[in-house]
Design a protein with these regions (language model features):
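ABC ATPase NBD coupling module
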Residues: 23-26, 83-107, 133, 139
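Conserved ABC ATPase signature
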Residues: 163-167, 171
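Hydrophobic anchor residue at the start of the ABC signature
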Residues: 177, 189, 205, 226
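Conserved small/polar residues in nucleotide/adenosyl-binding loops
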Residues: 54, 215-222, 226
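Conserved ABC ATPase "signature" region
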Residues: 79, 83-86, 140-158, 211
C-alpha cells in the first residue's frame, strides 16, 4: 500500500434481503455489489463507470456508511479502510453513529440536488450546518465561510437567504457542492452529480468540479472521461 493511499476498498459486497410470505420472512436477496476492490490515493480523481443499476450509487453510499439509514437490514461485507493522518479506520466495521466523528473527512454530492437539500432551510443554513456540527467556528466566522464557499462555486452572497425552490437545478447542485466543501474533506464522493441536469448546465458543473479539483468523481456519463485520471469499469 502506498503511503499516499486514502482509502482501500477490499472485496466489498452489498446484499439487500427480499421478504415474502405471510410472515414476511427472507425468501431471497439482491446482490447490488459483488466482491469489488479498488483504492484511491490522496489528490487522485477516480471515476466508477457503469450502466444504470449496476451498483455505483450503492458503492458510494457504502463508502460513507449510510446504507443502514436507507435499508436497516442490508448486508455489507468486505472492508472500507480509510487512512486519516496516521489513523486507520474501517468504515465497514463501524455503526453509522460511530462514523459521525469522521463525517467531516468524507462528504458526498448527491445525484438529485433538490432531494438532497432541506426545503425548509435557506442556503446559508444548509452550507453552515456541517460547520456547526464539525467545527468550533463562531457565528460570524461561519457566515464568512459560507459566503466564501458560495462565491467559490459561482453563487452570489445575496443568494444566501434564499430557499432551494428559488434556484435552478444547476444552482442547487452548486449549493450541494459548497456544502460538501465546507469541512475541507479528505474525500468527496459524487453520485452522478450532473445526470439530472440539462446538457448545457452539465458542462458548467463539470467545469466547476474540475476547478476545485475533486478527489473522487463517480458517474456513468462519458463526460467523466474528461475529468477523471483513472476510470474503473
Amino acid at each position: 500500500m502506498s503511503k499516499s493511499t486514502l482509502v482501500n476498498v477490499k472485496n466489498l459486497s452489498v446484499r439487500f434481503p427480499v421478504y415474502g410470505g405471510v410472515l414476511s420472512r427472507k425468501v431471497a436477496e439482491v446482490r447490488a455489489v459483488d466482491d469489488i476492490s479498488f483504492s484511491i490515493g490522496r489528490s487522485e480523481i477516480v471515476g466508477l463507470v457503469g450502466e444504470s443499476g449496476c451498483g455505483k450509487t450503492t458503492v458510494g453510499r457504502a463508502m460513507i456508511n449510510i446504507l443502514k439509514y436507507v435499508a436497516p437490514d442490508v448486508e455489507v461485507g468486505g472492508n472500507i479502510i480509510y487512512h486519516f493522518d496516521g489513523e486507520t479506520v474501517d468504515f465497514a466495521e463501524l455503526h453509522p453513529r460511530q462514523v459521525r466523528k469522521y463525517r467531516s473527512r468524507v462528504q458526498m454530492i448527491f445525484q438529485d440536488p433538490y432531494a438532497s437539500l432541506n426545503p425548509r432551510m435557506t442556503v446559508q443554513q444548509t452550507v453552515e450546518e456541517p460547520l456547526k456540527i464539525h467545527t468550533e467556528l463562531d457565528k460570524g466566522k461561519r457566515k464568512e465561510k459560507v459566503i466564501a464557499l458560495l462565491e467559490k462555486v459561482g453563487l452570489r452572497s445575496d443568494q444566501a437567504g434564499r430557499f432551494p425552490h428559488e434556484f435552478s437545478g444547476g444552482q442547487r447542485q452548486r449549493v450541494g457542492i459548497a456544502r460538501a466543501l465546507a469541512t475541507n474533506p479528505d474525500l468527496i464522493i459524487c453520485d452522478e452529480p450532473v445526470s439530472a441536469l440539462d446538457v448545457s448546465i452539465q458542462a458548467q458543473v463539470i467545469n466547476l468540479m474540475m476547478a476545485v479539483s475533486y478527489t473522487h468523481l463517480r458517474a456513468h456519463e462519458t463526460e467523466a472521461d474528461l475529468v477523471c485520471r483513472l476510470l474503473l469499469e
